[in-house]
UniProtKB/Swiss-Prot annotation:
Keywords, alphabetical: Antibiotic, Antimicrobial, Cytolysis, Fungicide, Hemolysis
Any one Gene Ontology BP term: defense response to bacterium
Name of the protein in its database record: Cryptonin
Role this protein plays: Antimicrobial peptide, active against the Gram-negative bacterium E.coli K12-594 (MIC=3.12 ug/ml), the Gram-positive bacteria B.subtilis KCTC 3086 (MIC=3.12 ug/ml), S.aureus KCTC 1928 (MIC=25 ug/ml) and M.luteus KCTC 3063 (MIC=1.56 ug/ml), the antibiotic resistant bacteria methicillin-resistant S.aureus (MRSA) (MIC=25 ug/ml) and vancomycin-resistant Enterococci (VRE) (MIC=25 ug/ml), and the fungi C.albicans KCTC 7965 (MIC=50 ug/ml) and C.tropicalis KCTC 1925 (MIC=3.12 ug/ml). Has very low hemolytic activity on rat erythrocytes.
Biological source species: Cryptotympana dubia (Korean horse cicada)
Length: 24
């Protein structure tokens, strides 16, 4: 429920950060 949604949001944020680091 809520925990799953939060985990997904954090996961997406982490992925974006990782992608930005790789693109750099």
């Amino acid at each position: 429920g809520l925990l799953n949604g939060l985990a997904l949001r954090l996961g997406k944020r982490a992925l974006k950060k990782i992608i930005k680091r790789l693109c750099r």
